[in-house]
Amino acid sequence: MKILAISDIHGKKSDKLIDYLKKEDISALLIAGDITDFQITEFEPLSFVKPFIDEIVEEADVDVFAIPGNCDPAGICNAIKESGPDEKPAFCMHNQLIAYENVVILGYGGSNPTPFNTPGEVDDDDIYLRVYELLAEYDYIGNTDAKRVTILLTHAPPYDTKADLLPDGTHVGSQGVKKPIHEFQPNINICGHIHEACSIDKVGQTIVANPGMLENGNAILIDIDEDAKFTVEIVEL
Protein backbone atom coordinates (compact mmCIF):
# COMPACT_ATOMS: atom_id res chain seq x y z
CA MET A 1 0.00 0.00 0.00
CA LYS A 2 1.22 3.46 -0.90
CA ILE A 3 0.40 6.57 1.13
CA LEU A 4 1.34 10.07 -0.03
CA ALA A 5 1.75 12.99 2.37
CA ILE A 6 1.60 16.68 1.50
CA SER A 7 1.37 19.89 3.49
CA ASP A 8 0.92 23.65 3.31
CA ILE A 9 -1.31 24.03 0.27
CA HIS A 10 -2.34 27.59 1.22
CA GLY A 11 -5.20 27.70 -1.27
CA LYS A 12 -3.18 26.74 -4.35
CA LYS A 13 -4.17 23.69 -6.39
CA SER A 14 -1.62 21.35 -7.99
CA ASP A 15 -2.32 19.39 -11.17
CA LYS A 16 0.96 17.57 -10.61
CA LEU A 17 -0.42 16.17 -7.35
CA ILE A 18 -3.42 14.54 -9.01
CA ASP A 19 -1.28 13.20 -11.84
CA TYR A 20 1.12 11.64 -9.33
CA LEU A 21 -1.66 10.08 -7.25
CA LYS A 22 -3.10 8.41 -10.34
CA LYS A 23 0.21 7.34 -11.85
CA GLU A 24 1.58 5.79 -8.65
CA ASP A 25 -1.68 4.07 -7.57
CA ILE A 26 -1.77 5.80 -4.18
CA SER A 27 -4.31 4.47 -1.66
CA ALA A 28 -4.43 7.38 0.79
CA LEU A 29 -3.43 11.02 0.98
CA LEU A 30 -2.33 12.63 4.25
CA ILE A 31 -2.58 16.42 4.45
CA ALA A 32 -0.54 17.92 7.30
CA GLY A 33 -2.40 21.22 7.57
CA ASP A 34 -2.71 24.68 6.05
CA ILE A 35 -5.03 23.57 3.27
CA THR A 36 -6.20 27.15 2.99
CA ASP A 37 -5.09 30.43 4.58
CA PHE A 38 -6.89 33.02 6.69
CA GLN A 39 -5.02 35.79 4.82
CA ILE A 40 -6.53 34.96 1.41
CA THR A 41 -8.62 37.87 0.11
CA GLU A 42 -9.50 36.78 -3.46
CA PHE A 43 -12.06 34.26 -2.15
CA GLU A 44 -13.50 33.05 1.14
CA PRO A 45 -10.70 30.82 2.48
CA LEU A 46 -12.85 27.86 3.54
CA SER A 47 -14.55 27.76 0.12
CA PHE A 48 -11.31 26.28 -1.28
CA VAL A 49 -11.38 23.14 0.84
CA LYS A 50 -14.26 21.06 -0.55
CA PRO A 51 -13.50 21.58 -4.28
CA PHE A 52 -9.81 20.85 -3.63
CA ILE A 53 -10.49 17.57 -1.81
CA ASP A 54 -13.43 16.57 -4.03
CA GLU A 55 -11.28 16.79 -7.16
CA ILE A 56 -8.54 14.70 -5.57
CA VAL A 57 -10.94 11.95 -4.47
CA GLU A 58 -12.92 11.89 -7.71
CA GLU A 59 -9.90 11.98 -10.02
CA ALA A 60 -7.49 9.76 -8.08
CA ASP A 61 -9.83 7.57 -5.98
CA VAL A 62 -7.85 8.02 -2.76
CA ASP A 63 -8.88 8.25 0.88
CA VAL A 64 -8.05 11.64 2.41
CA PHE A 65 -6.97 12.21 6.01
CA ALA A 66 -6.29 15.83 6.93
CA ILE A 67 -5.57 18.06 9.92
CA PRO A 68 -5.74 21.84 10.40
CA GLY A 69 -2.66 24.03 10.24
CA ASN A 70 -2.01 27.26 12.07
CA CYS A 71 -3.15 29.34 9.06
CA ASP A 72 -6.45 27.49 8.56
CA PRO A 73 -9.38 29.56 9.88
CA ALA A 74 -12.04 28.38 12.32
CA GLY A 75 -14.38 25.86 10.72
CA ILE A 76 -11.64 23.99 8.88
CA CYS A 77 -12.48 20.59 10.39
CA ASN A 78 -16.12 20.89 9.34
CA ALA A 79 -14.99 21.89 5.85
CA ILE A 80 -12.77 18.80 5.67
CA LYS A 81 -15.52 16.48 6.93
CA GLU A 82 -17.98 17.89 4.39
CA SER A 83 -15.56 17.11 1.55
CA GLY A 84 -15.39 14.03 -0.65
CA PRO A 85 -18.33 12.05 -2.04
CA ASP A 86 -20.73 10.30 0.35
CA GLU A 87 -19.13 6.92 -0.32
CA LYS A 88 -15.61 8.23 0.26
CA PRO A 89 -15.69 11.17 2.70
CA ALA A 90 -12.58 12.94 3.92
CA PHE A 91 -11.55 12.57 7.55
CA CYS A 92 -10.50 15.41 9.83
CA MET A 93 -7.90 13.77 12.04
CA HIS A 94 -7.47 16.60 14.56
CA ASN A 95 -7.24 14.97 18.00
CA GLN A 96 -8.36 11.66 16.48
CA LEU A 97 -6.98 8.23 15.72
CA ILE A 98 -8.16 5.76 13.12
CA ALA A 99 -7.16 2.31 11.89
CA TYR A 100 -6.70 2.10 8.13
CA GLU A 101 -5.66 -1.21 6.59
CA ASN A 102 -2.48 -2.12 8.56
CA VAL A 103 -1.85 1.48 9.60
CA VAL A 104 -2.96 3.54 12.59
CA ILE A 105 -3.13 7.29 11.92
CA LEU A 106 -3.09 9.66 14.90
CA GLY A 107 -3.59 13.36 14.20
CA TYR A 108 -3.14 16.71 15.91
CA GLY A 109 -3.33 20.02 14.04
CA GLY A 110 -2.32 23.60 14.68
CA SER A 111 1.11 24.78 15.74
CA ASN A 112 3.03 26.13 18.68
CA PRO A 113 2.93 29.98 18.90
CA THR A 114 4.50 31.98 16.05
CA PRO A 115 5.37 35.69 15.68
CA PHE A 116 2.47 36.07 13.22
CA ASN A 117 -0.59 35.64 15.46
CA THR A 118 -2.24 33.02 13.26
CA PRO A 119 -5.62 31.49 14.18
CA GLY A 120 -4.48 27.90 14.74
CA GLU A 121 -1.77 28.47 17.35
CA VAL A 122 -1.81 26.34 20.50
CA ASP A 123 0.26 26.61 23.66
CA ASP A 124 3.07 24.06 23.48
CA ASP A 125 2.12 22.53 26.83
CA ASP A 126 -1.38 21.89 25.47
CA ILE A 127 0.06 20.31 22.32
CA TYR A 128 2.13 18.00 24.51
CA LEU A 129 -0.90 16.98 26.57
CA ARG A 130 -3.09 16.22 23.55
CA VAL A 131 -0.45 14.37 21.54
CA TYR A 132 0.60 12.42 24.64
CA GLU A 133 -3.03 11.41 25.28
CA LEU A 134 -3.48 10.24 21.68
CA LEU A 135 -0.35 8.13 21.70
CA ALA A 136 -1.10 6.81 25.19
CA GLU A 137 -4.62 5.83 24.13
CA TYR A 138 -3.31 3.76 21.25
CA ASP A 139 -0.54 2.34 23.44
CA TYR A 140 -3.24 1.18 25.88
CA ILE A 141 -5.82 -0.21 23.44
CA GLY A 142 -3.54 -1.31 20.60
CA ASN A 143 -3.10 -5.00 19.87
CA THR A 144 0.64 -5.53 20.17
CA ASP A 145 0.38 -8.79 18.20
CA ALA A 146 -1.01 -7.01 15.15
CA LYS A 147 1.54 -5.82 12.61
CA ARG A 148 0.72 -2.16 12.13
CA VAL A 149 2.53 1.03 11.20
CA THR A 150 1.78 4.01 13.45
CA ILE A 151 1.75 7.40 11.73
CA LEU A 152 1.54 10.54 13.85
CA LEU A 153 0.20 13.35 11.63
CA THR A 154 1.00 16.83 12.99
CA HIS A 155 1.24 20.27 11.46
CA ALA A 156 3.98 21.41 13.81
CA PRO A 157 7.32 19.64 13.35
CA PRO A 158 9.21 18.32 16.37
CA TYR A 159 11.73 20.80 17.75
CA ASP A 160 15.42 20.65 16.83
CA THR A 161 15.11 18.46 13.75
CA LYS A 162 15.65 19.00 10.04
CA ALA A 163 11.87 19.38 9.77
CA ASP A 164 11.70 22.60 11.82
CA LEU A 165 14.79 24.35 10.46
CA LEU A 166 14.49 27.86 9.01
CA PRO A 167 16.93 28.97 6.29
CA ASP A 168 18.82 31.08 8.85
CA GLY A 169 19.52 27.99 10.97
CA THR A 170 16.89 28.66 13.65
CA HIS A 171 14.82 25.75 14.98
CA VAL A 172 11.18 26.75 15.53
CA GLY A 173 9.37 23.44 16.04
CA SER A 174 7.30 22.11 18.90
CA GLN A 175 8.60 20.52 22.08
CA GLY A 176 4.99 19.45 22.59
CA VAL A 177 5.29 17.21 19.52
CA LYS A 178 8.85 16.06 20.18
CA LYS A 179 8.44 14.93 23.81
CA PRO A 180 5.64 12.38 23.22
CA ILE A 181 7.47 11.10 20.14
CA HIS A 182 10.43 10.38 22.44
CA GLU A 183 8.13 8.67 24.93
CA PHE A 184 6.05 6.49 22.57
CA GLN A 185 8.18 6.19 19.42
CA PRO A 186 5.51 5.98 16.71
CA ASN A 187 6.94 4.61 13.48
CA ILE A 188 6.51 7.80 11.46
CA ASN A 189 5.75 11.48 12.12
CA ILE A 190 4.45 13.39 9.11
CA CYS A 191 4.55 17.14 9.72
CA GLY A 192 4.65 20.44 7.84
CA HIS A 193 4.51 24.13 8.79
CA ILE A 194 8.07 25.05 7.79
CA HIS A 195 7.82 25.43 4.03
CA GLU A 196 11.54 25.29 3.29
CA ALA A 197 12.27 22.30 5.54
CA CYS A 198 11.41 19.43 3.19
CA SER A 199 13.38 16.64 4.86
CA ILE A 200 13.57 13.24 6.48
CA ASP A 201 15.08 12.93 9.95
CA LYS A 202 14.74 10.83 13.10
CA VAL A 203 13.72 11.33 16.72
CA GLY A 204 14.91 8.15 18.37
CA GLN A 205 13.51 5.40 16.14
CA THR A 206 10.71 7.58 14.77
CA ILE A 207 11.13 8.76 11.18
CA VAL A 208 10.20 12.45 10.92
CA ALA A 209 9.23 13.61 7.42
CA ASN A 210 8.24 17.10 6.27
CA PRO A 211 7.10 17.35 2.62
CA GLY A 212 7.47 21.13 2.61
CA MET A 213 5.05 23.48 0.86
CA LEU A 214 3.02 21.81 -1.89
CA GLU A 215 3.79 24.64 -4.30
CA ASN A 216 7.47 23.65 -4.13
CA GLY A 217 6.58 20.33 -5.79
CA ASN A 218 7.55 17.69 -3.23
CA ALA A 219 5.71 15.08 -1.18
CA ILE A 220 6.49 12.17 1.13
CA LEU A 221 5.83 8.65 -0.14
CA ILE A 222 5.24 5.87 2.39
CA ASP A 223 5.24 2.34 0.97
CA ILE A 224 3.95 -0.36 3.35
CA ASP A 225 3.84 -4.10 2.70
CA GLU A 226 1.46 -6.66 4.20
CA ASP A 227 3.94 -7.42 7.00
CA ALA A 228 3.98 -3.73 8.00
CA LYS A 229 7.49 -3.20 6.71
CA PHE A 230 7.77 0.26 5.23
CA THR A 231 9.92 2.81 3.44
CA VAL A 232 9.71 6.59 3.58
CA GLU A 233 11.10 8.85 0.87
CA ILE A 234 10.86 12.36 -0.54
CA VAL A 235 9.40 12.38 -4.05
CA GLU A 236 9.05 15.05 -6.70
CA LEU A 237 5.54 15.46 -8.07
Identify what each model region corresponds to.
Residues 1-4, 97-107, 145-151, 202-207, ...:
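Beta-strand-turn-beta hairpins that frame and shape the catalytic cleft
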Residues 5-8, 29-34, 64-70, 91-94, ...:
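Active-site neighborhood of phospho(di)ester-bond hydrolases with catalytic His/Asp-centered motifs
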Residues 5-11, 40-45, 165-169, 186:
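Short, flexible loop segments at the rims of nucleotide/cofactor-binding pockets, characterized by
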Residues 13-100:
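Core catalytic region of metal-dependent phosphoesterases/phosphodiesterases
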Residues 22-24, 54-61, 144-146, 181-184, ...:
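Short, conserved loop/helix-junction motifs that constitute active-site signature segments
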Residues 72-172:
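Conserved catalytic scaffold of divalent metal-dependent phosphoesterases
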Residues 160, 165-226:
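Conserved beta-sheet core of the metallophosphoesterase superfamily
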Residues 232-237:
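Short, solvent-exposed aromatic-acidic interface loops
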